[in-house]
């Protein structure tokens, strides 16, 4: 907030991973942001769509190779995945009025991911155009995290150095 990281009382502010994504299935521990909007789930959906065994070797690189090549099944799964993530970004934006949401992790390096995610996010607003309550709702920018797949490690290091500075 106001240009500073918000850490929260227990230093978990901004940890959106464990937000429940389906109130009707509260007991289902897989219905949270970390499970539904993860690379693991993206690959799970792709395996299912392609009728591959659950243990079929697959990673983000091979998935995006298929998607970038225009494979219909990969693009269908990517649209579904990006819609799920976009809904959560919408919720976060409405709740906190954030300026930007930074997407991290290894797949965040894929231009197709960000393009598809932005398209899904814009589609949410377009699907409710004309609804009175939508008029004043904020919109955020979706950007790649500066440290992509190393974001967690950089965050830990930054927190450590900040804490050490306060001690000196």
Segments from the language model and where they lie:
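A short acidic/small-residue loop/turn micro-motif
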Residues: 8-15
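ATP-binding/phosphotransfer module of carbohydrate and carboxylate kinases, centering on a glycine-rich
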Residues: 5, 21-168
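A cytosolic small-molecule/anion-sensing beta-strand core signal
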Residues: 1-2
């Amino acid at each position: 907030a106001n240009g500073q990281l918000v850490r929260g009382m227990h230093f978990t502010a901004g940890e959106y991973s464990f937000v429940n994504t389906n109130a009707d299935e509260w007991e289902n521990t897989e219905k949270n942001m970390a499970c539904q909007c993860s690379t693991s789930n993206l690959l799970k959906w792709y395996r299912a769509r392609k009728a591959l065994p659950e243990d079929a070797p697959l990673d983000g690189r091979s998935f995006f190779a298929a998607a970038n090549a225009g494979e219909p099944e990969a693009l269908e799964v990517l649209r579904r995945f990006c819609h799920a993530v976009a809904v959560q970004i919408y919720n976060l934006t409405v709740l906190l009025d954030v300026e930007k949401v930074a997407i991290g992790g290894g797949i965040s390096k894929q231009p197709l991911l960000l393009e598809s995610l932005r398209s899904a996010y814009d589609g949410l607003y377009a699907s409710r155009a004309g609804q009175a309550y939508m008029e004043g709702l904020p919109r955020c920018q979706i950007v790649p995290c500066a440290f992509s797949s190393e974001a967690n490690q950089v965050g830990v290091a930054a927190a450590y150095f900040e804490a050490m500075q306060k001690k000196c």
